[in-house]
Amino acid sequence: MMENFVVSARKYRPSNFKSVVGQGHITTTLKNAIKNNHLAQAFLFCGPRGVGKTTCARILAKTINCEKLTADFEACNQCDSCKAFNNNASFNVHELDAASNNSVDDIRNLVDQVRYAPQQGQYKVYIIDEVHMLSNQAFNAFLKTLEEPPKYAIFILATTEKHKIIPTILSRCQIFDFNRIQINDIADHLKYIAREEKIEAEEEALRLIATKADGALRDALSIFDLIVTYSAGNKLTYQETISNLHILDYDYYFKVVDALLAENISNVLLIFNEILKKGFDGHNFIIGLSEHFRDLMVCKDPATIGLIEVSDAAKERYLDQSQQCSISFLLSALNLCNQCDIQYKASKNQRLHVELALMKMAKLPQAISLAALAQQESKKKV
């Protein structure tokens, strides 16, 4: 019989504040609230998808009902309350998905439940996910209970769209804004999971997944699971990752810039042709090339080098290539990429449109040299 597979996002869901990734400002505030007994009656957790809102709500619910808090105010995971919570058998935590239970009757049922004190533990916690989906009537039915709930009731509302929540609800809650998670934090967490799962993972591959996830850890874990499955389960390489995610290998951008600096139009066009044959879109290529030029520009100054989030090996390549490019070349190339990007969709022959931009870029070093020479000549005459 096949063993049930548990996705990484569930298997490695944090069980205490310490293991939450990239939300230190939130976890510190919540732990201090527990430590100083300054718990509000209602919290609003808002931020992008997959950054830990529901996870933090569950950890807070478990921690405030824990019978034997640790020295640093974390749940013990040993007492009856923690065990019941970990087994999804706690009567003190109620979760409501407002996306599917958004009517005024659903909220009235919730308000009726609030009247009953907890049988065991100190607090009854009500977690309402996707709270922005509640109807206006449901919000209004909820107002009085949210403002003056019984002392044992705590509400935690979670949303990705704070602007859709009516001001009267916002004013009754302590608002916590969750950040997008940094690429480094996601990559480190993926490295930890790969180690736990005994998977050989290349750092470049993990960084690529972290970048693709756009600050959402849950998305990163889903991509990680997908690529591990694709690669037969014990190895995760950069090449398999770019193949699976259909991302253009950044090595192509280095080759294109080398050819541009050498003013080799034929080579540039051949590389672009190879990229198109692999099924990549010309528009995405020009956007990627402009990002590459931006990264080279950033590498020109040691003060800004931290602005590019790549592995150390890739950073060395960017540094080497940036030394071969003048600021004038990079600015002019960025300008050409930008014009090509803006005009791409209006073009009747999009391939030629990109090729023309690349040919102009290939002649930039010569144009810059001639301009510098002309400037020197004019100075001599003066």
Set out the residue ranges of the language-model regions.
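P-loop/Walker A NTP-binding region and its immediately flanking N-terminal helices
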Residues: 1-175, 193
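Extended, largely alpha-helical regulatory/partner-binding modules appended to the mid-to-C-terminal parts
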Residues: 87-91, 106-109, 122, 158, ...
